[in-house]
Amino acid sequence: MKLINKKKVIFLLSGKGSNLLTILKKNLISPKFTPVCLISNNYISEKIKELIVSNKLETKIYERILKLTPKFIGECDVIFSVGYLKKIDPQIIDNYEIINLHPSLLPKYKGLMTHKRMLINNEASYGYSIHRVTKYLDDGEILSQKKGKINSSDEFELSSNHKRLEHQNVYKNLIKFLN
């Protein structure tokens, strides 16, 4: 399926890709962008690959890319990082618009292990931030945030609630940015 006159988006991911799968499914219902490339330092889930193939999307897939370099980045309007846990090459940062989905309400809890640190510090809220990527870790302009109330000291429950919040809202936030 060729999506004409749609913004070209490259996605970066490290984990299972549940946010990416949700974003891609919602985009198929009402196409707002063309996913031109998926890049992971891990394996990309079979569900995502099946979705790409069954909908005849012209999307390149790169897996197990241990060092992201400019050679993997083609023509795109924006790069959207959804759970990408590696540093991005400064040359890529300098030459592309990059948006990151971060699992905390920035500026708090930059970097990794955000849920554990929220619980250690007895935070009342959790949430995510969508921000521009700069050469400084999780320090770019915040474009959007969404929060929820922490109801338990269980890290697994917090993580599940957090994923649910992201799945319900991230696509809308991404589309607002692309318009």
Located regions from the model:
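One-carbon transfer enzymes
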Residues: 1-179
